[in-house]
C-alpha cells in the first residue's frame, strides 16, 4: 500500500505544471536591464528597477551565469534577462 501511495504522489508531482516565479528587477548599476531575444542575444527592450516579472525558465551559459526567460507583468516583451539582476522570493 505504501508503494502505491508513493507511486501516486510521484505521478502527481510530475504531472503538476511548475508555477512561474515572480521576481523584481534589481540592477545595482541603476541602468535599465536589457531584454534579449536569447541569452546575450539581440536587445528587444529594457526593464527598469522595480519592474515585476514572471520567470518562465532559467538556463546557465558556458560561464555558469544564469539567464531567465521572463514576461513582464506590465505591458512589455517576453525575453531573456541576466539572472543576477533579478530578486526572487517565494
Residue ranges with predicted function:
Residues 47-84:
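SH3/SH3-like beta-barrel superfamily modules
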Residues 21-36:
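Short N-terminal segments immediately surrounding and downstream of signal-peptide cleavage
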Amino acid at each position: 500500500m505504501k508503494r502505491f501511495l508513493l507511486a501516486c504522489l510521484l505521478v502527481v508531482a510530475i504531472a503538476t505544471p511548475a508555477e512561474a516565479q515572480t521576481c523584481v528587477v534589481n540592477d545595482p548599476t541603476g541602468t535599465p536591464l536589457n531584454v534579449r531575444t536569447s541569452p546575450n542575444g539581440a536587445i528587444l527592450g529594457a526593464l527598469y528597477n522595480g519592474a515585476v516579472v514572471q520567470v518562465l525558465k532559467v538556463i546557465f551559459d558556458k560561464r555558469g551565469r544564469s539567464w531567465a526567460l521572463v514576461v513582464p507583468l506590465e505591458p512589455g516583451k517576453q525575453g531573456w534577462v541576466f539572472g543576477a539582476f533579478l530578486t526572487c522570493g517565494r
